[in-house]
């Protein structure tokens, strides 16, 4: 009887929207009550889809928001109702077999279930070992107590892992924010020439932050869920251990399986000593280099090419572009002229028309899209010795060549003097070029006896510098397109 009354009362204080006991109940003037959250959400939905019309979800009578009032009386009833425990009849159902209606007195060892005497005689449990619940209660009490201690230990580990992952997440955030600040500060002085480097580095850090924090956030969520799972499991076991024998053994198979199947998952971490460490560029060196390039450009001279009968290079009418003929055709047509196809390289060189005998001189050469070239300065051709290539046309400073070159599209090198064992072969030294130049600047300081090469594409970084050059006679700009038919172009000072 009392149970039926409680059911009726519960129906009266149930929210018509969420069908749960009212939470912070609000009443409309029509008399219907709703959870504050439910009626608020309904109000917003009505405003969105029904052009501002507000009506009771139950009786559809219109209402105004200012007429909604908190219902303290209903709230008190709900609070009291939540405190009401199960009736004796409802509690009695737990002690009886759901299938046979008999009292649950036995425990099946194989299935780890509490059963009645009719269950024991059924086909399902035939041949199983059954005991009175009191006979196995102590055994399972010990098992669950041991499991509880193990779970508490794992719970502590889970909480520590959760705390560690939170700390690591915060640490990563601070570290990356610090790096971002450093990047911004380091690039401040060279904003005009380092914008792209700054942007690139910041994008890398943003990507690193996004990837790592996303992974750590995912791990954090997993650790929170794992910790919550542990808490619920511990709470369940504590409740069983503090309750009756029936509560201890009811569903014990399921909880034991959960414990046996449970493994403590550890979060994915990112060791800081393995991360990509940001290295700020040598800003002072870059600034000095930029200033040096700005300084040498004051000595820019308008260089043009000087056609001659020695070179087989193709010079354009504007005398600024030089390209190579097809080497195979030239070799077949004039095979007697060259000792080998390899010597073809020396016969495609061309000089600039300007003779340098003193002072400072600078010019730039466009080498974009070329896979091979040689450029620098030369002490001049010797037409009478044209065929004596080994002595007069190999690229060594002692023979009057201060040049650098490219071959196979990626191999940059400088030509130095050969050894005493190979006097007629230059010593080719590889150059480290991070950004391939589309334009190369050449600067000659005749009095200082230096020839410098700048990567204009990379903010004027110095590619190489010849020192202590022996300028015993006039030198000329030198260009050689090698066997690549794409032209080299002398840039005008206005470009």
UniProtKB/Swiss-Prot annotation:
Keywords tagged on the record: Acetylation, Antiviral defense, Autophagy, Coiled coil, Cytoplasm, Immunity, Innate immunity, Metal-binding, Nucleus, Phosphoprotein, Transferase, Ubl conjugation, Ubl conjugation pathway, Zinc, Zinc-finger
InterPro entries xrefs: B30.2/SPRY, B30.2/SPRY_sf, Butyrophylin_SPRY, ConA-like_dom_sf, SPRY_dom, TRIM/RBCC, Znf-RING_euk, Znf_B-box
Subcellular location: Cytoplasm; Nucleus
GO BP terms: activation of innate immune response; autophagy; defense response to virus; innate immune response; positive regulation of canonical NF-kappaB signal transduction; positive regulation of MAPK cascade; positive regulation of NF-kappaB transcription factor activity; protein K63-linked ubiquitination
Reactions that this protein is recorded to catalyse: S-ubiquitinyl-[E2 ubiquitin-conjugating enzyme]-L-cysteine + [acceptor protein]-L-lysine = [E2 ubiquitin-conjugating enzyme]-L-cysteine + N(6)-ubiquitinyl-[acceptor protein]-L-lysine
Superkingdom per UniProt: Eukaryota
Start-end of B box-type zinc fingers: 92-133
Chain intervals annotated as zinc finger (RING-type): 15-60
PROSITE patterns (UniProt xref): B302_SPRY, ZF_BBOX, ZF_RING_1, ZF_RING_2
Pfam families: SPRY, zf-B_box, zf-RING_UBOX
Residues forming coiled coils: 137-225
Known pathway: Protein modification; protein ubiquitination
Single GO cellular component term: P-body
N-acetylalanine modifications at: 2
Reported function: Capsid-specific restriction factor that prevents infection from non-host-adapted retroviruses. Blocks viral replication early in the life cycle, after viral entry but before reverse transcription. In addition to acting as a capsid-specific restriction factor, also acts as a pattern recognition receptor that activates innate immune signaling in response to the retroviral capsid lattice.
Complex formation: Can form homodimers and homotrimers. In addition to lower-order dimerization, also exhibits a higher-order multimerization and both low- and high-order multimerizations are essential for its restriction activity. Interacts with BTBD1 and BTBD2. Interacts with PSMC4, PSMC5, PSMD7 and HSPA8/HSC70. Interacts (via B30.2/SPRY domain) with HSPA1A/B. Interacts with PSMC2, MAP3K7/TAK1, TAB2 and TAB3. Interacts with SQSTM1. Interacts with TRIM6 and TRIM34. Interacts with ULK1 (phosphorylated form), GABARAP, GABARAPL1, GABARAPL2, MAP1LC3A, MAP1LC3C and BECN1.
Domain comment quoted from the record: The B box-type zinc finger domain and the coiled-coil domain contribute to the higher and low order multimerization respectively which is essential for restriction activity. The coiled coil domain is important for higher order multimerization by promoting the initial dimerization. The B30.2/SPRY domain acts as a capsid recognition domain. Polymorphisms in this domain explain the observed species-specific differences among orthologs.
Official protein name in the record: Tripartite motif-containing protein 5
Species the sequence originates in: Colobus guereza
